[in-house]
């Protein structure tokens, strides 16, 4: 059913009564005609006020199924604004002002079984609200007069200005504009022609044109509806001047107050308010404050708000779990029984209404308050089982043995839900620990110390679980839960172990091979397994030892030497392996440490073994040191002596002991020749028995400068003799002569080759692509050229201009061709050299030279020869009639013919 407001009950009853009276005749006629399933009216009408509230009934639509007992479902076309219940009563779905577009909608009725559908139109007529006169702020048009000026005793005295009361104008006024407010007049308008004007905000200042004044009559008017929320008061000033613009009256101030109307709906600062309340809170506990604001005047009822709770979801544990202060908006608890495990969140619909909460004239708005019930620790954790079981192999650590599960009704992942586990019994040695899984809140029983199966094979642990925070007072449950964990240890094949490990023995060096050192045996921790152990060598750097694979006897295979490089600080380390016969086999390692005791088995020697001394030493002494691989007492102090043989050793040298390890070798004579001397020195250690050794000290005698050896003298002594220098010079001269002769021979060979090429027999000079294979520099691809280029060499494009000295001798010159004079006579046969040179020069300057330096072809005329038939040539008998001067134009190759048959008198 729609929620009926008390103030609308008479209206609803009237509407229902009218509908009943209106439908009476129809029902009376039901027996006289066939019944039709559907709505009883084609159109339903309702008359309501514009502002409606949520749940307010508007009208009742009637539907008949003609006694078929149909299951009818109703629905409106605008469910956001209107809803209909099963009895056909149409109610407002929310609080709002009905607009003309919303005043008409459809109501649907559908058979839930057959899905048959009917509909009807609903039209709502909006009734005006009967309120006090909205225009009570308008006073009857009155008149405001300017104060007059009087004269007293010949002086003009101004009358005190009147105090003009404010003019009240309601906002949002309706009607035609401009609307007259007040008339302004001066007493002097009877004698003068005056002009009236107003100034100030709303007149000649922004907002412009809100107020205007008739300049002749002085009537002040407002031009449009006012809005108090924008400007609550206007301050204007009225002026009166004559036609010349001279002020005739003092300006008067006019105050226009905009009267507030209830035209603003309350607005909540937030549409959704969130708050929290701990579960189990007592009645009267503060939750939160909701706030709404109203744009109307807060000093008037239009802006005075009142709050109330329209609904609470869910309604358990109490339908009125919360209440609200209607003036402040404070929400507090009204009833007890807040339990987060039952209801985690409450949703309240809060309504704010102006007009001090008057449901008839006030405007309302709603917001949602979401109140979350926060958790407190009112539920302890409880184990899901009384006993948990687990197993773990022996000697394993950081292994999860068992997973303990608990349940807690408090909010997950909070201190009231997080579990803390403790072991309170069965683990006296502290081999187990329990960690909490942050996600699942389970307890993970973990092994933190190795467990030996042979020592203990079963553990019974007693564990408890509790929350991170204490339970609140008044809870009847125990704060903790107890369970038992049974852990079984699994036996595994363990590694054999040597004892002791490492094993240290002391042994004098020099022990021969095959001697028994010690027994190094291992034990098997698996007492309940019948297994054998075998031994092997894992590490023996000097290869001095061997171990018996059955009993672990260690014997030597070489002489033990303390001075070996494998011995560090008198200690020699060897590693051995013990392996059992299990499946799979397990092994363990053991280290044998042999501390070698020193014996006197190393003779001392001198250090350094080579020194330098000046030929005239000053001081004439050398410091030497004795070294011994043995250690005390088999080393120093040492005895230094010079042998008696050879005799010159003691004659020239003497040795003096400075300390137990140091001595000084001195020169007895004043100087020595340059050279190298080997001085024998006999050194004896302090061992028992003592060991002696003769060491040779290499002494280099050299020339000294400022006490240090110099290399000048040896260099001078190694100079070359005169004969060697002369021999070197002769060799150099001979080499230069050979090079010069080779160069001269090469030049002569080049000249002979060039002369031979110019003196080729004319019979052999065919040049028909003759290819030479007996010379370097080219093959067929270099000399097999196009004959057309030889027939017409003038068509060949000249190459890029080359500097002098770079152009080939057979290239065509790019400058003008020289004019050759006609020879008067053939050269003398003896002048062959000049003939060759002239021919060479002419060939070099021949403009028709081929592009390659090779033999040319002269007997190939080809097609289209310009020579014509040979029959056209005249015989020698007609030489007087022939002109052979054109032979001079054919180049040097026809120069001989030109000389023989030319027109010269010679």
From Swiss-Prot:
Region annotated Disordered, chain positions: 775-800, 863-884
Glycosylation site residues: 274, 326, 403, 573, 623, 652, 693
Residue ranges constituting the Cadherin domain according to the UniProt record: 161-268, 269-383, 384-498, 499-604, 605-714
InterPro entries xrefs: Cadherin, Cadherin-like_dom, Cadherin-like_sf, Cadherin_CS, Cadherin_pro_dom, Cadherin_Y-type_LIR, Catenin-bd_sf
Keywords: Calcium, Cell adhesion, Cell junction, Cell membrane, Cleavage on pair of basic residues, Glycoprotein, Membrane, Metal-binding, Repeat, Signal, Transmembrane, Transmembrane helix
Binding of Ca(2+) 2, residues: 171, 229, 260-261, 263, 296
Residues at which Ca(2+) 3 binds: 262, 264, 294, 302, 354
Primary subcellular site in the record, as a coarse category: membrane
Keyword presence, Glycoprotein: yes
Record's keyword annotation contains Metal-binding: yes
Domain notes: Three calcium ions are usually bound at the interface of each cadherin domain and rigidify the connections, imparting a strong curvature to the full-length ectodomain. Calcium-binding sites are occupied sequentially in the order of site 3, then site 2 and site 1.
Protein's name in the database: Cadherin-2A
Organism lineage string: Eukaryota, Metazoa, Chordata, Craniata, Vertebrata
């Amino acid at each position: 059913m729609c929620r009926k407001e008390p103030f609308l009950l008479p209206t609803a009853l009237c509407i229902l009564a009218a509908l009943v009276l209106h439908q009476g005749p129809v029902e009376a006629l039901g027996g006289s005609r066939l019944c039709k399933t559907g709505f009883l009216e084609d159109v339903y009408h309702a008359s309501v006020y514009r502002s409606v509230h949520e749940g307010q009934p508007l009208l009742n639509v009637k539907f008949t199924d003609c006694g078929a007992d149909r299951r009818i479902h109703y629905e409106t076309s605008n469910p956001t604004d209107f809803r209909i219940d099963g009895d056909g009563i149409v109610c407002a779905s929310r609080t709002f002002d009905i607009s003309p577009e919303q005043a008409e909608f459809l109501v649907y009725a559908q058979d839930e079984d057959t899905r048959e559908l009917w509909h009807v139109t609903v039209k709502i007529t909006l009734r005006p609200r009967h309120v006090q006169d909205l225009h009570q702020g308008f006073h009857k048009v009155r008149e405001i007069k300017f104060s007059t000026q009087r004269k007293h005793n010949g002086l003009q005295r101004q009358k005190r200005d009147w105090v003009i009361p404010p003019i009240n104008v309601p906002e949002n006024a309706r009607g035609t504009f401009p609307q007259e407010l007040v008339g302004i007049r001066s007493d002097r308008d009877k004698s003068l022609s005056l002009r009236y004007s107003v100034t100030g905000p709303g007149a000649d200042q922004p907002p412009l044109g809100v107020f205007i004044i008739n300049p002749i009559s002085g009537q002040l008017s407002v031009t449009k509806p006012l809005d108090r929320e924008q400007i609550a008061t206007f301050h204007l000033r009225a002026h009166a001047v004559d036609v010349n613009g001279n002020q005739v009256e003092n300006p008067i101030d006019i105050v226009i107050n905009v009267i507030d109307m209830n035209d603003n709906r309350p607005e909540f600062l937030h549409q959704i308010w969130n708050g929290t309340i701990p579960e189990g809170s007592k009645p009267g506990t503060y939750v939160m404050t909701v706030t709404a604001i109203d744009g109307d005047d807060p000093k008037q009822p239009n802006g005075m708000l009142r709050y109330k709770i329209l609904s609470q979801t869910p309604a358990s544990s109490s339908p009125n779990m919360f209440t609200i202060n209607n003036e402040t908006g404070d929400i507090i608890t009204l009833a007890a029984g807040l339990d987060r495990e039952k209801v985690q969140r409450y949703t309240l619909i809060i309504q704010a209404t102006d007009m001090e909460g008057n449901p008839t004239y006030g405007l309302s708005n709603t917001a949602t308050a979401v109140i979350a019930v926060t958790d407190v620790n009112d539920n302890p954790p409880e184990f899901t089982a009384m006993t948990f079981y687990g197993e773990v192999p022996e000697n394993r650590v950081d292994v999860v043995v068992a997973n303990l599960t608990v349940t807690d009704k408090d909010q997950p992942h909070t201190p009231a839900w997080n579990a803390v586990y403790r072991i309170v019994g069965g683990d006296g040695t502290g081999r187990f620990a329990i960690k909490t899984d942050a996600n699942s809140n389970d307890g993970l029983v973990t092994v933190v110390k190795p467990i030996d199966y042979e020592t203990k094979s079963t553990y019974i642990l007693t564990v408890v679980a509790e929350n991170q925070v204490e339970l609140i007072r008044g809870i009847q449950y125990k704060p903790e839960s107890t369970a038992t964990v049974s852990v079984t240890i699994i036996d595994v094949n363990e590694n054999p172990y040597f004892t002791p490990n490492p094993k240290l023995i002391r042994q004098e060096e020099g022990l021969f091979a095959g001697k028994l050192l010690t027994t190094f045996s291992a034990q098997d921790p698996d007492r309940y397994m019948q297994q054998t152990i075998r031994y092997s060598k894992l590490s023996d750097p000097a290869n001095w030892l061997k171990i018996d694979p059955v009993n672990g006897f260690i014997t030597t295979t070489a002489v033990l030497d303390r001075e070996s490089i494998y011995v560090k600080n008198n200690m020699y380390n060897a590693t051995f392996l013990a392996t059992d016969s299990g499946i799979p086999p397990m092994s363990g390692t053991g280290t044998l440490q042999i501390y070698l005791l020193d014996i006197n088995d190393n003779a001392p020697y001198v250090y350094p073994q080579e020194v330098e001394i000046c030929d005239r030493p000053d001081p004439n002494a050398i410091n030497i040191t004795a070294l011994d691989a043995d250690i005390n007492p088999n080393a120093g102090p040492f005895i230094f002596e010079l042998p008696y043989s050879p005799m010159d050793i003691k004659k020239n040298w003497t040795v003096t002991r400075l300390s137990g390890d140091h001595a000084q070798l001195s020169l007895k004579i004043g100087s020595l020749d340059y050279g190298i001397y080997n001085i024998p020195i006999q050194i004896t250690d302090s061992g028992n028995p003592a060991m002696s050794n003769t060491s040779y000290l290499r002494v280099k005698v050299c020339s000294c400068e400022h006490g240090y050896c110099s290399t000048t003298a040896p260099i001078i002594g190694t100079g070359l003799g005169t004969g060697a220098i002369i021999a070197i010079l002769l060799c150099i001269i001979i080499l230069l002569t050979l090079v010069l002769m080779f160069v001269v021979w090469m030049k002569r060979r080049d000249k002979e080759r060039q002369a031979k090429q110019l003196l080729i027999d004319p019979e052999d000079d065919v040049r028909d692509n003759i290819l030479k294979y007996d010379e370097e520099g080219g093959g067929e691809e270099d000399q097999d050229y196009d004959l057309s280029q030889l027939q017409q060499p003038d068509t060949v494009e000249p190459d890029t201009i080359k500097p002098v000295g770079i152009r080939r001798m057979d290239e065509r010159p790019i400058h003008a061709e020289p004019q050759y004079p006609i020879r008067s006579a053939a050269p003398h046969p003896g002048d062959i050299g000049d003939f060759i040179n002239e021919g060479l020069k002419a060939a070099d300057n021949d403009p028709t030279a081929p592009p390659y330096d090779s033999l040319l072809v002269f007997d190939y005329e080809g097609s289209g020869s310009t020579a014509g038939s040979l029959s056209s040539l005249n015989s020698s008998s007609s030489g007087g009639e022939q002109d052979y001067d054109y032979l001079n134009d054919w180049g040097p190759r026809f120069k001989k013919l030109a000389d023989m048959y030319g027109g010269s008198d010679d």
